[in-house]
UniProtKB/Swiss-Prot annotation:
The keyword DNA-binding applies. InterPro entries: DNA_clamp_sf, Pr_cel_nuc_antig, Pr_cel_nuc_antig_C, Pr_cel_nuc_antig_CS, Pr_cel_nuc_antig_N. Keywords: DNA replication, DNA-binding, Nucleus. This protein is an auxiliary protein of DNA polymerase delta and is involved in the control of eukaryotic DNA replication by increasing the polymerase's processibility during elongation of the leading strand. Its main location: nucleus. Belongs to the PCNA family. One of its GO terms (biological process) is regulation of DNA replication. It comes from Pisum sativum (Garden pea). Residues 61-80 bind DNA. This is Proliferating cell nuclear antigen. GO terms for cellular component: PCNA complex.
Length: 266
């Protein structure tokens, strides 16, 4: 038996909005410690890892480890029916091929339940090794989203370069080029508006902007984003979910030679 009750139901809606563009079908894994998901995007370039810890739920019951295959677009459609202030409960019986979403208004004068068929999804769990990163940048998530959006009007790729001067985002395309530099600033009164850079050695890596723009769909989940870079590893773009866990996106850097074949189709 699985029963999870989340008072801040809008959180689940935001989580789904942040990942449904990248991943169509995925297994949600429930255990005694939390509700998680790990899935590759359809082109096997990006990986999404989600964790919602059990202690972040008002009520969390998971009698045994359970994997529930769901179509994320269908799940998002159901969650759209919940009001932003609604309490969301997710229920599934052992051996059942359906999951139930229950939405309660805060005054409890309206209760809706939606049942969705589960899917059989073959998915392999990729071991994500803990790594030491050459550079870690923490910055306001809205600023990162704006930079990715602005640069994608010029080019298809972004070079993220971290040095003593700060973090530089640059692109070039048919109409010209653009560089945006963010310097470390920790003196601001509001810590969530700070840009903090930890660097062991300089790093410069190139990534497809369409993926970065997709990752920024998670901006509503957190006021800051952490970008971890190392020359031989995928970048990690992490949005912490207050008191509960995180959404992490992993993306392999682009190598110059494969630039042509990975260009998005017009």
């Amino acid at each position: 038996m699985l029963e999870l009750r989340l008072v801040q139901g809008s959180l689940l809606k935001k989580v789904l909005e942040s990942i449904k563009e990248l991943v169509n079908d995925a297994n949600f894994d429930c255990s005694s410690t939390g509700f998680s998901l790990q899935a590759m995007d359809s082109s096997h370039v990006a990986l999404v890892a989600l964790l919602l810890r059990s202690e972040g739920f008002e009520h969390y019951r998971c009698d045994r480890n359970l994997s529930m295959g769901m179509n994320l677009n269908n799940m998002a459609k159901m969650l759209k029916c919940a009001g932003n202030d609604d309490i969301i409960t997710i229920k599934a019986d052992d051996g059942s091929d359906t999951v139930t979403f229950m939405f309660e208004s805060p005054t409890q004068d309206k209760i809706s339940d939606f049942e969705m068929k589960l899917m059989d999804i073959d998915s392999e769990h990729l071991g994500i090794p803990e790594a030491e990163y050459h550079a870690i940048v923490r910055m306001p998530s809205a600023e990162f989203a704006r930079i990715c959006k602005d640069l994608s009007s010029i080019g298809d790729t972004v070079v993220i370069a971290v040095s003593k001067e700060g973090v530089k985002f640059s692109t070039k395309g048919d109409i010209g080029s653009a560089n945006i530099v963010c310097r470390q600033n920790t003196t601001v009164d509001k810590p969530e508006e700070a840009t903090v850079i930890e660097m062991n050695e300089p790093v410069a890596l190139q990534f497809a902007l369409r993926y970065m723009n997709s990752f920024t769909k998670a901006t509503p989940l957190s006021s800051s984003v952490t970008i971890s870079l190392s020359n031989e590893l995928p970048v990690v773009v992490e949005y912490k979910i207050a008191e509960m866990g995180y959404v992490r996106f992993y993306l392999a850097p682009k190598i110059e030679e494969d630039e042509e074949e990975t260009k998005p189709q017009a």
